[in-house]
Structures are given as structure tokens and as C-alpha cells.
Amino acid sequence: MRLTPHEQDRLLISYAADLARRRRARGLRLNHPEAVAVITDHLLEGARDGRTVAELMVSGRDVLGRDDVMEGVPEMLHDVQVEATFPDGTKLVTVHHPIP
């Protein structure tokens, strides 16, 4: 199987998010890279499902809460940005302060 660098990046995000979700299911609090992976995967999959940029910008703030992540992670995570593929093309999705 041959993947482009872009496809490799998305596969890595998906795998990292899956690993982070399994850790969260075991009761562990997520670190910064794990939190970014989970939120980014949510945005990529939402775009694939046909949701709008505006919907994803709102729902991206509901993926994780302060209780899901290690202390200090919400303060380190100001924005999450990803270029997601929508039915009408690729668009940049930005979620400001994703962990309220």
C-alpha cells in the first residue's frame, strides 16, 4: 500500500487519537499531544461525514473537558487547526480554546 505524505499524516493522527481514547477509557488523563490528536481526529472525521466548518468549530470545543486532560494542558492549547477534506473541497478548520 502506497500512501502520500498527506495520507500518512492523517493515518498517524487517527492512530494517535485511537491510542489516546483507549488510555482515556482506562481512566488516564491525556497529555498535550494526545489531546490534540483526539480533537484533530474529531474534526477530520466530522468533515468526512459532511458537517460544516461552523459546526466543527463549535463541536470541537465539546470533545474534551478539563477533567479529561492533565493539569496545564488547557492553558497550553490555544488553537487546534487542521486542513480537512469536505465534500466541496479542502478547508482550514480552527478551534479556538478547544478545552474550555
From Swiss-Prot:
Principal subcellular localization: cytoplasm
Signal peptide region: none
Keyword Ion transport tagged: no
Disulfide-bond pairs as recorded: none
A Gene Ontology molecular function term of the record: nickel cation binding
GO BP: urea catabolic process
Keywords: Cytoplasm, Hydrolase
Catalytic activity of the protein: urea + 2 H2O + H(+) = hydrogencarbonate + 2 NH4(+)
Domain of life: Bacteria
Pathway participation: Nitrogen metabolism; urea degradation; CO(2) and NH(3) from urea (urease route): step 1/1
Similarity field: Belongs to the urease gamma subunit family.
Record-linked PANTHER family: UREASE (PTHR33569:SF1)
The protein, known as: Urease subunit gamma
Gene encoding the protein: ureA
